[in-house]
């Protein structure tokens, strides 16, 4: 979904996206600030259930503004169920967002508090649609688990991902990334907030049901520095580190955030 007409600096960053993607000013944009006192506890929300088969992990790719870990998604070996969903959603990829300092980097915030980074695990509705490409623009097409990451202790669960970054230093590089279960990155509690929102970068489709975990996971300052050392340029060009790739929070515009707890 990356294209060269947008990015995260002053010239092509989030403040400019609406010129090319008017939906940037839509009514269901993400991320948002979760105000805990206004979130509505909803007893109808079921527990989140993830079942990921490590054999579906496929490859890691430098997409310029970030990196993606992609999964085989031609069957239901790796799925998300439960929560607000009646359908089953198939795992497609995960990626991270970060900032130029440890003070900020997450996209979602909680009561105005910014975290250092944020993990997004992306799934598409395989009960209703035949591919991610078909699902990505549909209102019930995508389900993304967001996990806030707080700077502190090094997180050993991230090590396999970080060790793979040297192989994809520049934009467009890809490398095999196999035998990995992203549920190992989830916090111990799967209490969550949920709301209807969007992709957080262009094309900004309002097609995402967000599951934001209440509990954060840890990441060390050194691990965050490894994210930032990824280069957004193609090989041979002047090195341009990916310093930040997070969109500021967007207005709720009347949407309700529900809590499972």
Swiss-Prot record:
PROSITE patterns: ALPHA_CA_1 (PS00162), ALPHA_CA_2 (PS51144). Substrate binds at residues 200-201. It catalyses: hydrogencarbonate + H(+) = CO2 + H2O; urea = cyanamide + H2O. The active site is at 65 (proton donor/acceptor). Its main location: cytoplasm. Gene3D superfamilies: Alpha carbonic anhydrase. It is an enzyme of class 4 (lyase). Keywords: Acetylation, Cytoplasm, Lyase, Metal-binding, Zinc. InterPro entries: CA_dom, CA_dom_sf, Carbonic_anhydrase_a-class, Carbonic_anhydrase_a-class_CS. Residues 240-249 have a biased composition (Polar residues). One of its GO terms (molecular function) is zinc ion binding. Inhibited by acetazolamide. Zn(2+) binds at residues 95, 97, 120. PANTHER family: CARBONIC ANHYDRASE, CARBONIC ANHYDRASE 1. Catalyzes the reversible hydration of carbon dioxide. Can hydrate cyanamide to urea. This is Carbonic anhydrase 1. The lineage of its organism: Eukaryota, Metazoa, Chordata, Craniata, Vertebrata.
């Amino acid at each position: 979904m990356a294209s060269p007409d947008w990015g995260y600096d002053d010239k092509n960053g989030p403040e400019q996206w609406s010129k090319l993607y008017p939906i940037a000013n839509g009514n269901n944009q993400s991320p948002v600030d979760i105000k805990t006192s206004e979130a509505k506890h909803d007893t109808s929300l079921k527990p989140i259930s993830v079942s990921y088969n490590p054999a579906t992990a496929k490859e890691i790719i430098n997409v310029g503004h970030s990196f993606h870990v992609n999964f085989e998604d031609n069957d239901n070996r790796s799925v998300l169920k439960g929560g607000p969903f009646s359908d089953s959603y198939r795992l497609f990829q995960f990626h991270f967002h970060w900032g130029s300092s440890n003070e900020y980097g997450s996209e979602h915030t909680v009561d105005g508090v910014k975290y250092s980074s944020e993990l997004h695990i992306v799934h598409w509705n395989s009960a209703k649609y035949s591919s991610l490409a078909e699902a990505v623009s549909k209102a019930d097409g995508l389900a993304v688990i967001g996990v806030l990451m707080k700077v502190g202790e090094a997180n050993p669960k991230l090590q396999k991902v970080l060790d793979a970054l040297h192989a994809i230093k520049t934009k467009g590089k890809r490398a095999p990334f196999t035998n990995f279960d992203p549920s190992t990155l989830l916090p111990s509690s799967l209490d969550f907030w949920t709301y209807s929102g969007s992709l957080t970068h262009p094309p900004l489709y309002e097609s995402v049901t967000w599951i934001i975990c209440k509990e954060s996971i840890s990441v060390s300052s050194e691990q965050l520095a490894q994210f930032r050392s990824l280069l957004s340029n193609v090989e041979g060009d002047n090195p341009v580190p990916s310093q930040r790739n997070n969109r500021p929070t967007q207005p709720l515009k009347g949407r309700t955030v529900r809590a499972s707890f």
